[in-house]
């Protein structure tokens, strides 16, 4: 990354590309025990959160990610009541999960409390549900939390992590996925952010392989736009314990969802289940 001439620029070595934001000032910086968190004011994209030099979110476009890591899985499950979010310290995913009235409890476990505190201060719109009676915010190791989670106690596990380096490295391997598999009920769903399908298809394939080794039998990778991330295109991957799951969703419920979204719709959900040919070929779909 670099900051010069009033621009914040993140370089993405795998594709020889970069993304930049014109900034008007630096608002805050915290070095937590785990990572460096910075907040900038941009001229056109609202506030910008950076973690260890990588863009995490902006005020203007975070809704793509938060809605797509939440609503497809929640509308795919028949009746999700107990949700666990690993990571997600900015609290945007928690907010989306708790838009579903049938959810009875949502536990968010992020290792770094400072991410949440910075989000509460600079992105309060993402933290609307932090005081919801159904919400539980924990600041602990997500790997350990899932390892100790009672068997068959969770409907959906959402892994809303940073890239598979540093504090998040342990969230992308067979051992962690085995813990998720154990904690999920038979009809449970695991959903994880799975990087850019344009630049990192090999990583997505590796993730799905590790999930399969842990016992998951069916997978679906959903691509979507995310302007602030490398290549501008991102994905989440859902995994099911069921063989040959088609990931059909409750379309009528999604159409009559009763809450506002900025990107997710039932029609969009239908379309995103059909992978682009190059993704389908690479992933064997």
UniProtKB/Swiss-Prot annotation:
SUPFAM superfamilies, alphabetized: S-adenosyl-L-methionine-dependent methyltransferases
Biological process according to GO: spermidine biosynthetic process
Catalytic reaction equation(s): S-adenosyl 3-(methylsulfanyl)propylamine + putrescine = S-methyl-5'-thioadenosine + spermidine + H(+)
Annotated residues for binding of spermidine: 66, 90, 160-163
Subcellular location: Cytoplasm
Pathway(s): Amine and polyamine biosynthesis; spermidine biosynthesis; spermidine from putrescine: step 1/1
Domain PABS: 5-241
GO annotation, cellular component aspect: cytosol
UniProt GO molecular function: spermidine synthase activity
Assembly: Homodimer or homotetramer.
Family indicated by similarity: Belongs to the spermidine/spermine synthase family.
UniProt name for this protein: Polyamine aminopropyltransferase
Species assigned in the record: Xanthomonas campestris pv. campestris (strain ATCC 33913 / DSM 3586 / NCPPB 528 / LMG 568 / P 25)
């Amino acid at each position: 990354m670099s900051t010069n001439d009033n621009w914040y620029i993140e370089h993405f070595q795998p594709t020889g590309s970069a993304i930049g934001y014109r900034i008007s000032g630096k608002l805050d910086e915290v070095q937590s025990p785990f990572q460096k968190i910075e907040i900038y004011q941009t001229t056109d994209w609202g506030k910008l959160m950076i973690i260890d030099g990588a863009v995490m979110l902006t005020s203007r476009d975070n809704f793509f990610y938060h809605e797509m890591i939440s609503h497809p899985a929640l509308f795919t499950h028949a009746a999700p009541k107990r949700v666990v979010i690993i990571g997600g310290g900015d609290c945007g995913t928690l907010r989306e999960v708790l838009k579903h009235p049938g959810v009875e409890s949502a536990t968010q476990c992020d290792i770094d409390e400072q991410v949440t505190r910075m989000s509460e201060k600079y992105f309060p719109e993402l933290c609307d549900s932090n005081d919801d009676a159904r919400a539980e915010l924990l600041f602990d190791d997500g790997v350990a939390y899932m390892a100790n989670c009672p068997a068959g106690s969770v409907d959906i596990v959402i892994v809303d992590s940073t890239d598979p380096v540093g504090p998040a490295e342990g969230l992308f391997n067979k051992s962690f996925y085995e813990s998720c598999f154990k904690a999920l009920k038979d009809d449970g769903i695991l959903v994880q952010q799975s990087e850019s399908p344009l630049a990192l298809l090999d990583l997505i394939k590796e993730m799905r392989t590790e999930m399969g080794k842990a016992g998951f039998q069916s997978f679906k990778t959903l691509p979507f736009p995310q302007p602030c991330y490398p290549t501008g295109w991102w994905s989440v991957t859902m995994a099911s314990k069921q063989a040959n799951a088609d990931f059909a969703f409750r379309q009528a419920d999604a159409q009559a969802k009763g809450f506002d979204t900025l990107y997710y719709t039932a029609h969009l959900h239908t379309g995103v289940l059909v992978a682009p040919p190059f993704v389908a070929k690479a992933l064997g779909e």
